[in-house]
Amino acid sequence: MHEWLEQARANLAGSVESSPADYELSQADVDELLELARIAAHESGERTNAPLVCYLVGLARGRHGGDLSALVAATVGK
């Protein structure tokens, strides 16, 4: 998974003339997002909600900043 993700990160950075380092995910970020995706898929009954809710959290973080853990918790109502 990580090799594919690294290539996707490099491709994304190149498409917006940025550094791949700008899109680096820590292991904690990966764990948070995978847990959010799991919750979204299981609680909603629709697997398609998993990537969409992760995208929404990414939009919120990009537009307003904030701690990823706090945004994930708010998203799932904790």
Named regions from a protein language model:
Residues 1-78:
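Feature captures hydrophobic
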